């Protein structure tokens, strides 16, 4: 695989980063590679006998082969469904890059490909001192942008791509994720996205609210 690890970000929160990330994991596995997910920071967790667990991180774990230890996949699991900076402060946690670098190194030793899912949109901070760009720089990862296809997505996608570039980071691909089944002229919007985003399209995920990640993998177009 050309990119053994990459960071999945989005044009906003709630636009389907986890849907895209789990589909990517299955698509990589369908090519015969081992692949594991990672959710460095997750807010909005539930208490379990094993500790705080997050729904999105569990989805990444389920789509991984081999399945990594949860604490390695999601080093910072924060209870409150708030921005990470607020959720961490609520429980007295200070986010640090070193544990995340160590966790990624462990995951890369376990699998050929690691799909790292970010939080919210690109500019959503991790803490008062850390932006996602700082994390991606520390992990030395390229970026894949998930575009939630709805009214306003062209503006959001262009702004996000420009912000990634301004941060000195490389966006290697984008994925169209259809999240509004009532959107008018969706084909025109996706065509315009393709014309205006400089990186290749890695796929178009159709609106299927109850679809399984393995089935959605067929809509992913991985680079050779």
UniProtKB/Swiss-Prot annotation:
Annotated positions binding ATP: 14-19, 56, 117-120, 177-178
CDD domains linked: DTBS
Species classification: Bacteria, Pseudomonadati, Pseudomonadota, Gammaproteobacteria, Lysobacterales
InterPro entries noted in UniProt: DTB_synth_BioD, P-loop_NTPase
NCBIfam families with a match to the protein in the record: bioD
Gene: bioD
Name used for this protein in its record: ATP-dependent dethiobiotin synthetase BioD
Catalytic reaction equation(s): (7R,8S)-7,8-diammoniononanoate + CO2 + ATP = (4R,5S)-dethiobiotin + ADP + phosphate + 3 H(+)
A GO term, aspect molecular function: ATP binding
